[in-house]
Amino acid sequence: MKKEKAVVVFSGGQDSTTCLLWALQNFEEVETVTFHYNQRHQEEIDVAKSIAEKLGVKNHLLDMSLLNQLAPNALTRDDIEIEAKDGELPTTFVPGRNLVFLSFASILAYQIGARHIITGVCETDFSGYPDCRDEFVKSCNVTVNLAMEKPFVIHTPLMWLNKAETWKLADELGALDFVKNNTLTCYNGIIADGCGECPACLLRNKGYDEYMKMKGERN
């Protein structure tokens, strides 16, 4: 464990919760930052606060409602259907979201004396989001370091993992059931197993089933 401080970009979903648990095993001090951008469901904010409290971690909640004004999308507007047309980005894409989140997480890290920033973005289960790519995160890391003259390190523990491998990591961290039962991934705001029908639930549940099958074959 590094005797250093880290900030986790935290939504209360499967990926960011797994990253938080990873951070707690790798850094002496860990805090989380959650962004309120008028998400479709208030439950996301409530779940993030609840998980942080259960794990004994300080949670910073930042108002980013400007994103909703600049980039109307299916994550913030009930009247926009969740869909992904061929050759187009999904309607759940929020332009610049991770750019903004990592920038503000870096500002927070600067203020609280943290060097490490952890985000759960992943390129393997790539949904067409350009700001989930490894090259984007590395570029952003260089930019925030230059902007603040600090040697920040942005970590992406899930970057090359598919959903089954992300469940495997949660299991290796001793928190498979915790992640399964306490996180919110569902676009319809249903905790744990979710609605089972939206794209996020389908991806999450497919990964869980694949991992449990692999785990059963090994045992």
From Swiss-Prot:
Enzyme class: ligase
Annotated cofactor note: Binds 1 zinc ion per subunit.
Pathway: Purine metabolism; 7-cyano-7-deazaguanine biosynthesis
Gene3D superfamilies reported in the protein's UniProt record: HUPs
Presence of the UniProt keyword Ligase in the record: yes
The organism's place on the tree of life at top rank: Bacteria
Alphabetical keyword list: ATP-binding, Ligase, Metal-binding, Nucleotide-binding, Queuosine biosynthesis, Zinc
EC number: 6.3.4.20
Gene Ontology biological process: queuosine biosynthetic process
Catalytic activity line of the entry: 7-carboxy-7-deazaguanine + NH4(+) + ATP = 7-cyano-7-deazaguanine + ADP + phosphate + H2O + H(+)
Record function comment: Catalyzes the ATP-dependent conversion of 7-carboxy-7-deazaguanine (CDG) to 7-cyano-7-deazaguanine (preQ(0)).
Subunit structure: Homodimer.
The family this protein is said to belong to: Belongs to the QueC family.
Name the record gives this protein: 7-cyano-7-deazaguanine synthase
Gene: queC
